[in-house]
């Protein structure tokens, strides 16, 4: 009996030891996005996450979509990093299968810098980077780098004629960029127990997703200042005013980059127009079927509860200081035409509307209606008609308050 007890205890201890060693050597960031996010500076507006696996690269090989978004030069630089570092025979086994995070940051000089953050396996030794320079014909020069309290290296990549700065963080997580200033920001990150400034996908969603994108809308404004000459950024204008976070999964499609997921809106911040849709439920979009063939880009919006949306819109006008002007306009229309336009108009509205810009820079608005004939009769009272089906509104700001 004692012999069996001793054997059982030995087996239990061996099992416990193997379990501890196993989980110690598991790479935590691969299944813990939050830990990696803590190593990314808070001024990141967008983070793109994907798995460093050959299948991901095979799917998008030769596809022009990413180049259309990032530009061929930037995509070419990232691809060179992949080939010369992640797929290098000295490094590949330590980074294969790990999730790569590419974050977008504005710089002091009104430029955009990318930060690449990814974990290495627990058995990776940073000294292996020094061996890269000894590989014949790889065109990489390695020199030590000290960024704050963090150690790393500078990789001069001959194929790009550029330096790539790399530092080691906790838990064998590495951060690298062509911008030395951005790497220095990484070195200054203070560790806290607070959550990263991004909404995250669940572990299951993250594991099943081909790629993910995380958006911090509060940081889009400084990013757009680097991209656009003015703040009237058309379809992006509402996003500049939105306070919230999105965690989205990539849906594979050969001719489009499509993401779906959830957005968390910060209710105590400044309310933008998009906040009005926070309590609406998804509905089928049908207006897209009648978009003109010359459409360059569009914004489609829909509501599931028109009564609730109308109330939210009215409250938004009040907070924005437009309520008085709205009341004066509709009172004027009532006095001049005898038409209670607001009440009758809302009763005829459908639940979809869209704004379209064509490749000729024409702007069109499309609104779904419950009864087009009745709406046409109603609008005749407040318009200068050119024929029975078209005309110009007699009150300039009327579309704004619709």
Located regions from the model:
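C-terminal soluble interaction/assembly domains
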Residues: 389-402
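Charged, amphipathic alpha-helical scaffolding segments
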Residues: 164-185, 254-266, 270-276, 289
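Helix N-cap motif at beta-to-alpha junctions
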Residues: 119-124, 178-183, 369-373
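Generic beta-strand structural signal
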Residues: 144-149, 166-170, 254, 357-358, ...
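Ordered core of a single globular domain
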Residues: 360-367, 373-376, 382
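A common structural junction motif
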Residues: 132-142, 193-194, 383-392
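A short, solvent-exposed beta-edge/loop patch
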Residues: 48, 154-192, 402
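Structural boundary/hinge residues at secondary-structure and domain interfaces
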Residues: 2-7, 11-156, 198-243, 260-360
């Amino acid at each position: 009996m004692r012999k069996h007890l001793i054997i059982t205890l030995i087996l239990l201890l061996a099992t416990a030891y193997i379990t501890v060693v196993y989980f110690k050597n598991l790479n935590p960031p691969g299944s813990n996005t939050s830990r990696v996010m803590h190593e990314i500076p808070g001024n990141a507006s967008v983070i793109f996450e994907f798995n460093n696996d050959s299948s991901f690269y095979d799917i998008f090989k030769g596809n022009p979509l990413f180049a259309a978004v990032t530009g061929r030069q930037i995509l070419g630089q990232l691809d060179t990093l992949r080939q010369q570092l992640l797929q290098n025979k000295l490094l590949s086994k330590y980074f294969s299968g790990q999730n790569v995070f590419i974050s977008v940051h504005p710089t002091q000089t009104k430029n955009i810098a990318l930060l690449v953050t990814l974990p290495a396996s627990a058995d990776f030794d940073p000294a292996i980077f020094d061996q890269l320079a000894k590989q014949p014909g790889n065109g990489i020069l390695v020199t030590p780098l000290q960024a704050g309290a963090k150690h790393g290296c500078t990789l001069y990549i001959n194929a790009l004629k550029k330096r790539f700065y790399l530092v080691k963080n906790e838990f064998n997580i590495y951060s690298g960029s062509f911008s030395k200033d951005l790497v220095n920001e990484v070195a200054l990150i203070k560790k806290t127990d607070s959550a990263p400034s991004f909404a995250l996908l669940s572990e299951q969603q993250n594991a099943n997703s081909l790629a993910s994108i995380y958006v911090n809308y509060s940081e889009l404004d400084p990013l757009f200042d680097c991209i656009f000459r003015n703040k009237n950024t058309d379809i992006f204008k509402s996003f500049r005013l939105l306070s919230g976070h999105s965690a989205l999964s990539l849906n594979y499609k050969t001719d489009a980059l499509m993401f779906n997921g959830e957005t968390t809106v910060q209710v105590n911040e400044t309310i933008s127009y998009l906040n009005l849709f926070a309590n609406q439920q998804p509905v089928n979009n049908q207006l897209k079927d009648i978009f003109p063939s010359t459409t360059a880009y569009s914004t489609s919006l829909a509501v599931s509860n028109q009564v609730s949306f109308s109330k939210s819109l009215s409250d938004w006008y009040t907070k924005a200081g437009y309520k008085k002007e709205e009341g004066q306009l509709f009172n004027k229309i009532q006095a001049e035409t005898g038409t209670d336009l607001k009440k009758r108009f809302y009763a005829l509205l459908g639940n979809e509307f869209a704004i379209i810009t064509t490749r000729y820079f024409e702007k069109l608005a499309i609104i779904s209606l419950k009864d087009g004939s009745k709406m046409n009769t109603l609008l005749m009272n407040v318009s200068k008609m050119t024929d029975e089906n078209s005309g110009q509104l007699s009150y300039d700001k009327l579309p704004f308050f619709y």
